[in-house]
Amino acid sequence: MIYGGVGVDTVYPDSIYIGKGVRITAGTKILTHYLDPSQPGVHFLRGEVHIEDDVFIGLNVCICSSVTIGKGAIIGAGSVVTKDIPPYQVWAGNPARYIKDRAK
């Protein structure tokens, strides 16, 4: 279920994969491209976002491109996800960091 106010990158929306039983709450942003600092001017790089089954994403989370959020993971409110999250773990913060494992 995707709640109101979720922002999905409109440049490459086909690069976002969302599994079954996923809950994405209001204010979350999902990004599929980023500015390439090694290039002059404005040059974007594309990356996919994979959100596996039974993930819960709290309020106002930013999910950066080129990440996978593993099955059953929980992402705390206000987090910025910049790297892969393993299955059945709780992560939170800016940048998001490991908090603890959760029951499977």
Which role fits each region the language model picked out?
Residues 2-68, 94-95, 100-103:
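Flexible, glycine/small-residue-enriched loop-and-beta-strand segment within the central core
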Residues 56, 74, 90-92:
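Short-chain dehydrogenase/reductase
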Residues 59-83:
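Beta-rich strand-turn-strand
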Residues 85-86, 94:
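Hydrophobic alpha-helix-in-membranes signature
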